[in-house]
């Protein structure tokens, strides 16, 4: 059995409902509905969730660990939420959040406007910082990757959009 799949999930004040092949996790920040793989059994035991594979096949063992991680992320998302911080490095690089849009000035001849999907918010504490927040970990990471993709950090000066915890290794310039 998967080592990840063995450990129970503490619900931390979230409500869980199991119905027709899907699990609904409800918390103070919102609700996430996730389909449950048929190779995994889910049991709710007084504030904890236990997952077990249906049989001892490799696929069922692997899916029990995967489903445990997905459900644990859903519980964390609806109780505490997820956030990803981005930093803009470069002269004239600016960001501004306006409602469900993120306006970026990244050295192009035109401003870049990124439309935020439903359930994901962007905040700009300063002009060179972006904080992306939401309850769905996958969605928050995807939006952060899309914003970073507009101008990834280049290897010579490090200019571009980077994650706040990202370390950009700079190359040395060509010498005569």
From Swiss-Prot:
Keywords: Ribonucleoprotein, Ribosomal protein, RNA-binding, rRNA-binding. It comes from the Bacteria. It holds the Pfam family Ribosomal_L6. GO terms for molecular function: rRNA binding; structural constituent of ribosome. The keyword Protein biosynthesis does not apply. Transmembrane segments: none annotated. GO terms for cellular component: cytosolic large ribosomal subunit. GO terms for biological process: cytoplasmic translation. InterPro entries: Ribosomal_uL6-like, Ribosomal_uL6-like_a/b-dom_sf, Ribosomal_uL6_a/b-dom, Ribosomal_uL6_bac-type, Ribosomal_uL6_CS. This protein binds to the 23S rRNA, and is important in its secondary structure. It is located near the subunit interface in the base of the L7/L12 stalk, and near the tRNA binding site of the peptidyltransferase center. Part of the 50S ribosomal subunit. HAMAP family: Ribosomal_uL6_B (MF_01365_B). PANTHER family: 60S/50S RIBOSOMAL PROTEIN L6/L9, LARGE RIBOSOMAL SUBUNIT PROTEIN UL6M. Belongs to the universal ribosomal protein uL6 family. This is Large ribosomal subunit protein uL6. The gene is rplF.
